[in-house]
Amino acid sequence: MEDKKLLIYELVEELNKLAYEYYVLDNPSVSDKDYDKKYDKLVELEKETGLVLPYSPTQRVGDVVLSKFDKYTHKGKLWSLGKAQSLKEVEDWHNKNVKAVNEYNLTHDDKLPPIKYIITKKFDGLTINCTYNEDGILVTAATRGTGEIGEEITAQAKTIKTIPLKIDNDAVIEVHGEAIMTKEAFEEYNKVAVVPLKNLRNGAAGALRNLNVKETARRNLSAFFYDIGYNEGTPFKTYGEMLKFIKDHGIPMDDYAMECSTIEEIEKEINYIEEIRNKLNYDIDGAVIAVDDMKTRELLGYTVKFPKWALAYKFEAQEATTKLLEVEWNVGRSGRVTPTAILEPVEIGGVTVKRATLNNMDDIERKGVKLGSTVFLRRSNDVIPEIMGVVEESLEGSKDIEAPTTCPYCGSEIVQEGVHYFCENTLSCKPQLVKSIVHFGSREAMNIAGFSEKTAEQLFEELEIKSISDLYRIKKEDLLKLNRFGEKKAQNLIDAIESSKECDLPSFIYALGIPNVGKKTSTDLCKKFKTLDNLKKAKFEELVSVEDIGDIVAQSVLDFFNDETILKSIDELLSLGVTPKFKEEEIKENIFNGKTVVVTGSLSSFSRNEIKEKLQSLGAKVAGSVSKKTDYVLVGKDPGSKYEKALQLNIKIISEEDFKNMIG
């Protein structure tokens, strides 16, 4: 029995270490299968011996439903922060700090160091306080509450897999942090939620203040820690020392923490954080500027509400509420009919927003959105904002949104497939045809120079170009009859259409617009099947054998090439002189062949598509996210969170200049 108990201690220590590698470092040293095997063994031993350590990974998720939240008195106060919304306010605060230090040093022998700050991101989540006892065991987690008294949420916090249940420390400490919901976790939760979450912050706060711990676990929260508010161990001399302690003890901490001494340096870092804000996988709403030296903090002191030695610089909100006026239904290239919300104009992040995304009728019903109601809006990554939910109090007098029964453009009957609506009139529905023709002629497809959506609409309206093959029947004299078409422009378009006939097979496959098939998948298919005929005859088993192609894409390809109308259209293109060929490129031995590369930031010599094509021509796989499988991260100007992740995982980082030198 003693041997089994000893094994429990060993397994708990090992599993906690492996969990830290997996959830915090994102760099697992064992497979999921090996981890599960060890975990199952621990569960078996705990049942057999009755010994369950308080920091065992088996204690993270329980089926418990609590009856109430107990009050918890914090050992150290959780202060609010003073706020600034302009750089002038930050400068005034900085000047006061410098003046206070200079005045102190004039009259004291124990001089204070020159003012230095550490800037960190201001996370937009729920503040939590985790207490570790003298054995390093997590004994309590609590909300901020009043700053002095919060609510105990220990069971809920234990569901956050990045929070260690035990650390190597022999003094009681309280660690302050922010529980957050990542954008990825938010999207995954909302896919299956009966009532979708409205924003990430509410997602995190609602999870931790839920008495049903199982529901907390479903939201898959994360956490970042940034302060030790109570410490019975050796005092810290600087904030930098404190942050190093947090990181060294395996407590999750954001990697971004920059030292600054001047207002110019502070401004530079604030601007940087604001630039990368939308690229992050979680929400931030500002930057925190805190004095580094602890003795200087003592000198500066506190007001009744907040410390004078720290300041929060607040960014403009990325969320707002406004009134939904009407819904406009649009038809895409595939015939899908999708709703767009027309809104009462509102400012979000310095931009006036008048339209927002409504994905489909199912999405509208789940969110409870109605005409005339007030809705929550969220804008991220400079794309069209999305409606996240409705203000319940605004529903009185609102009207239901009704799905159209006929196409808003051609009047054809609409059919429903799953949660989506489609116009099946592929022969004469203007938006479908125009967008299909534009896609066909785009740079990554047939590369017909100077061919815009405006031109496609004009050809549709005035020359009755109703199919892709009609493009190759256009004559110069036809174009000369049109508005805005002079001799030169007409000849240029005819030449561009003619030169597009000699094309490579991957571009042609991509141009055809097979559902779920992008440029990379088109290239992968061509590498496997070599010719158009081979691809048309491909079986399901052959398609799924291609790397990165799953059941859905394989079925899309099968369905596409089993459609007689599509096959007839392809034959027409071939008869008109379009000759797609696959060139098997021999890749010369180079440093990138067979490597996985991630690109972040903007490059001066390459567009995003150009660098992707260049890397692929060298035999590299271009990935969209950084992981332990990444070999290189190519960093341009203003890199995003991928750069930070690469530093964390110790992945080789190369500049644009390095890249050019490496390929010769």
From Swiss-Prot:
Keywords: DNA damage, DNA repair, DNA replication, Ligase, Magnesium, Manganese, Metal-binding, NAD, Zinc. GO terms for cellular component: cytosol. Its cofactor is Mg(2+); Mn(2+). CDD domains: BRCT_DNA_ligase_like (cd17748), LIGANc (cd00114). Zn(2+) binds at residues 407, 410, 423, 429. NAD(+) binds at residues 32-36, 80-81, 144, 178, 314. It is an enzyme of class 6 (ligase). It holds the Pfam family BRCT. The active site is at residue 122. Belongs to the NAD-dependent DNA ligase family. LigA subfamily. Its EC number is 6.5.1.2. GO terms for biological process: DNA repair; DNA replication. HAMAP family: DNA_ligase_A (MF_01588). InterPro entries: BRCT_dom, BRCT_dom_sf, DisA/LigA_HHH, DNA_ligase, DNA_ligase_CS, DNAligase_adenylation, DNAligase_N, Hlx-hairpin-Hlx_DNA-bd_motif. Residues 587-664 form the BRCT domain. The gene is ligA. This is DNA ligase.
